[in-house]
Amino acid sequence: MTDSTNNAHFTSEERARHLLERLSGTGADSVSIPGTRVTSRSFAEMTTLRIGAAPAGVVECSSAEAVAQVVSFLDAHTQPLLIVGGGSNLVVGEGDEVSQLVVVLMSAGGGEGGVDKKGAAEKSAEGDVMIDRETGVVRAFAGVEWDQLVAATVEAGLGGLECLSGIPGSVGATPVQNVGAYGAEVAQVLRRVQLYDRTRGELEWVDPSALDLGYRYSNLKFTSRAVVTAVEFQLTTDGLSVPLRFGELARRLGVDADEAAAGEIRRPATDVRQAVLELRAGKGMVLDSADHDTWSAGSFFTNPIVTGEEARDAVVAAVREKCGDAEAESMPLYSVKSSGGDASGGGAGASVGEPQYKFSAAWLIERAGFAKGWHVPGNERASLSTKHTLALTNRGSATSADVVELARAVRTGVREAFGVVLEPEPIWVGVSID
């Protein structure tokens, strides 16, 4: 039988539509893949920033096998595609590049994001989530909502994810970005990751060591070679949190600063989760459709990392010149482990063992003159959050151009003030900050 999709007279849009018809079972040479559904949505509906045009179509997938089969089918026809989970780390444009895409949307099945909260012995390895209370091993389909997984693990008496409570998005994005907050990151509890290798056409489990994990980075972040389909974590079974090292969170829980610095203090994971949710809500970092401060891609810039004492001292000197001695002495500045030259942000090119130093992007943004709620003069459609300077927000009618204009203004201002180039954290589709 001839594959009608290979018709050379198809335009890009026509080819995408024809492939979607085949996947939906309504076109010629229809393809039936269990656990899939073809639908139409705009990126404004699929992302937390709520901007972006509509792609050619959306294929919802409710299992790793469905994702693998759909991606394989689209790749076989050289169809441009984008994998989307919670849409919390995307900035999407409105041009032709976007309208020609087919989105493969990870969508967990069942209620509460597919999280089964029964005893470990009753859990099915074929479900969206498997939690083993005895060993602390947790496995989740990539499409499960992240915070619902965190809530389920805390409720099950496991510790390790509580500091990452309230982060929007899906499980599959967490190892790609090496998601982190309040002194914890996914790399600390990651056991293994299931990938669909698009080159070999195979599903496989890989160890964290294969991902080159760094600060808000993995080697999956800027490549389309593989798709995360499931993630497995190793959590603790004593019901206690990870050590409380982040000052703001430690203070919220009544932990002395010196004790927190020692990195030995742990608290019940349930208490830590509640404290984190309260802190995030106060910064507009918990999704609320009625609050434009939450219409964002989360923390927009990564905390900059510089290599070597000379680079560190240059930033401190610039702060001292602009803001005075008191600010220079009290600015947030942390020594971090050398990345050995990976692309994890700021530390690229560092030799092994060379000291690296991390600054607070939010602190630098504010000291460069960008207050909470700041917007480009004459354009109020996009602004910094009124609660947190690190979030760039859609005030209700912003386009990608508005967000880019705001991001460029902030990045330029920080560079001119302190000589630091802020790196954006989101993935850009059909639009660029450069």
Curated annotation (Swiss-Prot):
Gene3D superfamilies: 3.30.465.10, UDP-N-acetylenolpyruvoylglucosamine reductase, C-terminal domain (3.90.78.10), Uridine Diphospho-n-acetylenolpyruvylglucosamine Reductase, domain 2 (3.30.43.10). Its EC number is 1.3.1.98. InterPro entries: FAD-bd_PCMH (IPR016166), FAD-bd_PCMH-like_sf (IPR036318), FAD-bd_PCMH_sub1 (IPR016167), FAD-bd_PCMH_sub2 (IPR016169), MurB (IPR003170), MurB_C (IPR011601), MurB_C_sf (IPR036635), Oxid_FAD_bind_N (IPR006094). Pathway: Cell wall biogenesis; peptidoglycan biosynthesis. It is an enzyme of class 1 (oxidoreductase). Its cofactor is FAD. The gene is murB. PANTHER family: UDP-N-ACETYLENOLPYRUVOYLGLUCOSAMINE REDUCTASE. Belongs to the MurB family. It comes from Corynebacterium jeikeium (strain K411). HAMAP family: MurB. Residues 51-238 form the FAD-binding PCMH-type domain. Cell wall formation. GO terms for cellular component: cytosol. The keyword Cytoplasm applies. The active site is at R216, S299, E425. GO terms for molecular function: FAD binding; UDP-N-acetylmuramate dehydrogenase activity. It is found in: Cytoplasm. It catalyses: UDP-N-acetyl-alpha-D-muramate + NADP(+) = UDP-N-acetyl-3-O-(1-carboxyvinyl)-alpha-D-glucosamine + NADPH + H(+). PROSITE patterns: FAD_PCMH. This is UDP-N-acetylenolpyruvoylglucosamine reductase. Keywords: Cell cycle, Cell division, Cell shape, Cell wall biogenesis/degradation, Cytoplasm, FAD, Flavoprotein, NADP, Oxidoreductase, Peptidoglycan synthesis. It comes from the Bacteria. GO terms for biological process: cell division; cell wall organization; peptidoglycan biosynthetic process; regulation of cell shape.
